[in-house]
UniProtKB/Swiss-Prot annotation:
Pfam families: Trm112p. It comes from the Bacteria. This is UPF0434 protein Ent638_1436. HAMAP family: UPF0434. PANTHER family: PROTEIN PREY, MITOCHONDRIAL, ZGC:162634. GO terms for cellular component: cytosol. It comes from Enterobacter sp. (strain 638). Belongs to the UPF0434 family.
Length: 60
């Protein structure tokens, strides 16, 4: 995941900061407890594609 891209993209739901989870290949929004998938290295920032996170998954 390109760190420059992480600096400019935001959660499509709340416009909050997204964090990259390398082990799960997801972008995490800690404010909404959502995980957005990466497909072929491309972030899929659609709310309908996001999965809800359990409380312990969204902690830093």
């Amino acid at each position: 995941m390109d760190h420059r891209l992480l600096e400019i993209i935001a959660c499509p739901v709340c416009n909050g900061k997204l964090y990259y989870s390398q082990d799960k290949q997801e972008l995490i929004c800690k404010l909404d407890n959502l995980a957005f998938p990466l497909r072929d290295g491309i972030p899929v920032l659609l709310e309908t594609e996001a999965r809800s996170l359990a409380a312990e998954e969204s902690r830093p």
